[in-house]
Amino acid sequence: MSETTPAPGFKPKKSVALSGTAAGNTALCTVGRSGNDLHYRGYDILDLANTSEFEEIAHLLVHGKLPNKAELAGYKAKLKSLRGIPAAVKAALEELPPSAHPMDVMRTGVSVLGCVSPEKDDHNHPGARDIADKLMASLGSMLLYWYHWSHNGRAIDVETDDD
């Protein structure tokens, strides 16, 4: 496929067709409150990125508030306990080639996880939070397991005490 270059002086037009149109209402995220900013549950993302750990922001998004020290310690312990991935997920990941894109690997892992650990019929808030926590905890495990298997032929233990 040949690359095309724009004519000299060509400037792409900024689409304004949906400017000012709400794409959806959510308590999780606000975009463009005062320009090109991003807020998670009212907190500026730049402030969070500079002062918070991953698990603190995850807790904010999933549970609605920043955790105190005790809550953060408990949340980290919970996520550690959820790192494991079922044998069926490992088997599916072992079939993926080393050339697979990491996003495709995670999508496949989540699809298999959803089949072997189906959601309950009632989607109450605590149940939905548990699902979000399980996904957050296991996505890294899926990616690491696949990478070590596909690139080194080695199955690794993903249930560790490592931070």
What label would you give each PLM region?
Residues 2-163:
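Hydrophobic alpha-helical bundle cores within soluble ligand-binding/oligomerization subdomains
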